[in-house]
Structures are given as structure tokens and as C-alpha cells.
């Protein structure tokens, strides 16, 4: 298995040169007191050491051994417990957590880059941590002060973990039909009864306690999603003094045997009258849980970027060393029997596609992180509201597009290796297996597309999109002549997106099938256009800073040109599919399939 080296140079370029994050942090008072350029750089350096030195060496062995279940207990692979203890001691679980309860309060722009390192180094290990961080976010946003004081400090410290319990055997996307029940008790608690499946980290041996956030319905709850409440259910009950007490009536019935992320325990959880406490308001549980789900959706999107980065690093190293045939223009390595395969056109196409998509995704994730920071910390209400709209618009795109292109990149990386890419020892086949799930969990990518098209575009008449479009057009208007080669095709793609949006909004009023028919291609078209915007911004920064590091910045410009020449044109075929409408999708009766 190849080594992982965090792309710190590229991450610094984004934070400092493209987005000028230090200047943003200094104008947001609550961040200014915690973070500056030097602190951010030190955190990234330490994160690179932790992920490359501690987590990456456990990736292959963790996949080989997998999580093991016996008599209700789960054992993580060898080395995971020790690594998690070191990881937790470093405060990484609470990186963006509320300082009032022991979190570090760092900006999301920094956290998304750390999460990418995590997923690149060891996707299975990362899931135990990111689920805990998401549970903390939901509890901090919606829990009572008593619950926050009792649980958050240990969760931020990594002593206790968190899980998200939504799915049931009969209820996946449609959570309105869940059957898990919550019966009120005289002491203010609830008895939780039901079975949840596909629960990441529902049971493990890494932490002293596991805090489950569980969706359930009260006996008199309204039907459907309007009757869902959210409950906190600890594995071990916690006393008023914070000490662990008796085991709660929640147990792991089994774990799933999966295609990938084998070191991550995916659990069947049985709640047999377990004690739980209400989080937020009665019958408002789905809204509260979406705080965690939206965090997880961005995080899982970043899994796609991380796996793609690891695949790219491995493929580049292999392509430089593997000797096969001669370059089309004649021998390059004259002292060898053949040239390295990196000289061949299609190998270069694959590597450049991986590089352009992965670096574009890294820029997009950092941009979403910036909007999350503005939504949380900006002093001006209008600025916060605009950032919130962009976060709502971009989150489904990030989750689906990062993971779709992440799988594409990992398959390309495997292809660069040829037959060796299909062999376990080289690591590429594990990356393909591990990244595949990212298109499925935390809301399948087609559900993300429906969310984007239905709720985030059509429902508000394209208002959220207009905010994004205005920002892109303002950037283009301020660009100098050197950027024309990037700005011109960017505006062409944006015009296409804007015009298609208007057409879909108009057609959806007459035929509700239009939303579903257009949604996946529309999301991809949006993704490629957003990447074009970010590649244009990276090109602008590279031109400004070129003299400081010509090799790096010239590489950025060359990759940007490849993106605009060879990848962005995909928007035209996607637009044709969107314009085709829903008719061809309904040409067959169900019996004809």
C-alpha cells in the first residue's frame, strides 16, 4: 500500500491565495480570537502527521481484518484502539466544536481540509470520528443545556462517541414510516423500542460510551415525517456526577458484511425499552437530525475527494515508474528498455482528469466551508442569510458530485495500474470499494439531486441559484484579459445552467415528473459549472502569485486549461439530456422492463 502525503501545498494555496481565509477570519470576531494564518498552518501540519503517520498505515490491515462481532460486542481491527486514543488526545473530534463545552471552535474551512486528509488516509477509521462530530453538532444546536453539559465535553474529548440512528429495515429514504417508538416516562425520560439498521459505529471498542441520536415516534404522534422526534440514548447511563452507570437496553444484534469500509462497524441496533431523552421539540426531530445529516452529507462528499486524492497519488507514482512501450514522439528514457507510461496520451488523460476533478473538489469543499463559516460567524444578518442560502444550495451538489467524480477518479486510478490495479496489494481496488458506498449512504445521490432540483431550485423559483450566479458573474466582470480563456467558457456554462433552470421551473408547474427527470443531469451540470468557477478563481490566484513559485502555479494553470478544454464540455451533453424532458423515461410500462 503506497504512503499518503497530505497535499499541504495545495491546501495552503486555497486558504491563503484563493480565498484569503486569514483575512476573513480576522473580520469575524468570534474566529479572530481563535485562529490566524500561523495557527491554521500548524494545525494542517499536525493533521498531516496524524493522518499520514498514524492512520494510513492501518488502512490495508484494517480492510483485511475488518470489524468483528461476537455476542453483541464489536472489536475493531488491530491498532485502531491505540490510534483512536492518540487521535482523541489531540482534540481532533472537537476541532470545530463549541468552546463552551470543550470544543476547539476552529473554522469549517480548515476542518474540511482535515477531513479530506482523514478519508484519504483511512476512510473506515474516519467514519467513527465524523459521526461523533456530527452528533455533537446536532446536540449543541438542539439539545437542552442539561444534555449539552452532561454529554458534549466527553464527546468532544473523544472519550465518548456518537452515532446517528435513522434507517429501519422497511424505512430508508422514507423516514416518515419508521416504527421505532418512544413512550413517555414519569421522570421525563422516554422508553425507546425498535430496530435500526446500517448504523455506523453503533457498537465499537474505541470509546467508553456511545451516544446514539435516535429518530422515534411518540404514541400520539401525527402520521408521516411530521410525527418524528429525536432522542438521545446512551449505551451506558450517565449519572448526575458524570460517572457511567448501568448498561442501557440497547444492543448490537449483528454487523453487516460489506463490499468496502470493512473496518467500520455497520450495525443492526436493537432498542429494547432503552432510556432516552428528548432532543429539541416533540415532533420536530427530523429538522433537528438534519443538522447532523447535512454535516454528514458534506463530510461524505469529502470522502469522495479524499479517496480520489489517495488514488491519484498512487497512480502518479506508478505511472512514473512503470515502463511500457515508447512515447509516440520517440524514446524518452533511452537508457531503459521502455519509457514510463506517464508519457502515453491516455495515461496522461486519466491522470489529468483525476487531478482536475480532485483539486476542483478540494476548492469547492473549501468554498462550502467558507459559506458555513459566514453563516455561523458573520456579524451582518444579510451576509449570514446569503451564506445560509448558498449552503442549502451547495450541500446536495457537494455530496453527490464529489462522490460521483470520486468514484470516477478511483476507477481511473485503478485503470492506470492495468492488471495490477485489480490486485489487492497495490491498494487501488480497496479505494474503489471504499468510495463506492459514498454514493449511497447519507442520502443516495439521486435523492441529493431531487433535493437540489425540487427544494433548492424549483421551490424558490431559482432564488438560491441566482445568488450563486450573481457571485460568479461579479467575478467574471472583474477579471482581467489574462483570464479570458477561463472566464468565457465559464460564462457559457453558467448561461446554460441559468437558462435550463428557468425552463425546468416553468415546466415543473405543468408536469411534476420533470423535476425527477432532470435532476441527476442537472446536478452534474451544476457541479461542472461550479468547478469551472473555482478553477477560474484558482487560475486568477496562480497568475497573481506566479513569480513566488513558478512550477506550482504553472501546474495549476495547465490543469485549469485541461479542465476547461476536456471536462467542462460535458455540460453540453448533460444539457441535452435535461432538455429532453420526462417523456422518454415513461415510454415503457412497468411490466415491459
PLM features: what roles do these ranges have?
Residues 1-126, 150, 373, 583-593:
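Amphipathic, small/basic residue-rich leader segments at the start of a protein or domain
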Amino acid at each position: 500500500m503506497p504512503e499518503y502525503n497530505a497535499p499541504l501545498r495545495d491546501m495552503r494555496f486555497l486558504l491563503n491565495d484563493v480565498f484569503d481565509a486569514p483575512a476573513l477570519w480576522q473580520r469575524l470576531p468570534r474566529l479572530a480570537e481563535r485562529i490566524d494564518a500561523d495557527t491554521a498552518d500548524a494545525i494542517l501540519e499536525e493533521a498531516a502527521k496524524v493522518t499520514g503517520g498514524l492512520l494510513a498505515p492501518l488502512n490495508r490491515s484494517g480492510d483485511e481484518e475488518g470489524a468483528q462481532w461476537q455476542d453483541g460486542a464489536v472489536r475493531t481491527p488491530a491498532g485502531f484502539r491505540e490510534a483512536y486514543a492518540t487521535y482523541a488526545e489531540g482534540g481532533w473530534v472537537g476541532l470545530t466544536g463549541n468552546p463552551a463545552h470543550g470544543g476547539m471552535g476552529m473554522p469549517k474551512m480548515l476542518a474540511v481540509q482535515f477531513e479530506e486528509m482523514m478519508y484519504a488516509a483511512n476512510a473506515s477509521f474516519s467514519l467513527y470520528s465524523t459521526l461523533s462530530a456530527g452528533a455533537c453538532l446536532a446536540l449543541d444546536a438542539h439539545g437542552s443545556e442539561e444534555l449539552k453539559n452532561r454529554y458534549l465535553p466527553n464527546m468532544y474529548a473523544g472519550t465518548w462517541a456518537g452515532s446517528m440512528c435513522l434507517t429501519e429495515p422497511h424505512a430508508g429514504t422514507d423516514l416518515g414510516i419508521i416504527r421505532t417508538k418512544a413512550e413517555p416516562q414519569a421522570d421525563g425520560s422516554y422508553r425507546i423500542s425498535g430496530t435500526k439498521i446500517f448504523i455506523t459505529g453503533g457498537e465499537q471498542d474505541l470509546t467508553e460510551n456511545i451516544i446514539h441520536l435516535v429518530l422515534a415516534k411518540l404514541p400520539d404522534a401525527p402520521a408521516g415525517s411530521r410525527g418524528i422526534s429525536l432522542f438521545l440514548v446512551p449505551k451506558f447511563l450517565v449519572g448526575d456526577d458524570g460517572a457511567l452507570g448501568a448498561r442501557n437496553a440497547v444492543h448490537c444484534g449483528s454487523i453487516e458484511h460489506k463490499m468496502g469500509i470493512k473496518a467500520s462497524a455497520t450495525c443492526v441496533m436493537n432498542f429494547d425499552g432503552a432510556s432516552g431523552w428528548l432532543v429539541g421539540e416533540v415532533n420536530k426531530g427530523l429538522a433537528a437530525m438534519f443538522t447532523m445529516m447535512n454535516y454528514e452529507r458534506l463530510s461524505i462528499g469529502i470522502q469522495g475527494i479524499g479517496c480520489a486524492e489517495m488514488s491519484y497519488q498512487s497512480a502518479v507514482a506508478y505511472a512514473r515508474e512503470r515502463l511500457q512501450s515508447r512515447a509516440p514522439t520517440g524514446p524518452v528514457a533511452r537508457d531503459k528498455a521502455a519509457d514510463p507510461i506517464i508519457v502515453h496520451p491516455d495515461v496522461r488523460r486519466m491522470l489529468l482528469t483525476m487531478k482536475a476533478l480532485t483539486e476542483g473538489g478540494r476548492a469547492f469543499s473549501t468554498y462550502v466551508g467558507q459559506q458555513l463559516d459566514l453563516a455561523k460567524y458573520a456579524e451582518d444578518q444579510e451576509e449570514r442569510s446569503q451564506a445560509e442560502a448558498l449552503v442549502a444550495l451547495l450541500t446536495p451538489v457537494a455530496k453527490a458530485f464529489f462522490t460521483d467524480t470520486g468514484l470516477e477518479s478511483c476507477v481511473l486510478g485503478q485503470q492506470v495500474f492495468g492488471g495490477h490495479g485489480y490486485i489487492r496489494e497495490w491498494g487501488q481496488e480497496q479505494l474503489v470499494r471504499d468510495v463506492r458506498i459514498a454514493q449511497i449512504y447519507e442520502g443516495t445521490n439521486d435523492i441529493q439531486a431531487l433535493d437540489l432540483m425540487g427544494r433548492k431550485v424549483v421551490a424558490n423559483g431559482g432564488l438560491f441559484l441566482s445568488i450563486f450566479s450573481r457571485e460568479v458573474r461579479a467575478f467574471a466582470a472583474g477579471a482581467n484579459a489574462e483570464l479570458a480563456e477561463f472566464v468565457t467558457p465559464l460564462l457559457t456554462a453558467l448561461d446554460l445552467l441559468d437558462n435550463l433552470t428557468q425552463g425546468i421551473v416553468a415546466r415543473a408547474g405543468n408536469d411534476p415528473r420533470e423535476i425527477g427527470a432532470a435532476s441527476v443531469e442537472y446536478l452534474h451540470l451544476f457541479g461542472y459549472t461550479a468547478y469551472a468557477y473555482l478553477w477560474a478563481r484558482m487560475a486568477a490566484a496562480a497568475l497573481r502569485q506566479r513569480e513566488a513559485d513558478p512550477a506550482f502555479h504553472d501546474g495549476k494553470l495547465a490543469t485549469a486549461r485541461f479542465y476547461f478544454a476536456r471536462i467542462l464540455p460535458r455540460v453540453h451533453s448533460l444539457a441535452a439530456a435535461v432538455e429532453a424532458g420526462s417523456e422518454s423515461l415513461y415510454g415503457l410500462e412497468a411490466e415491459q422492463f
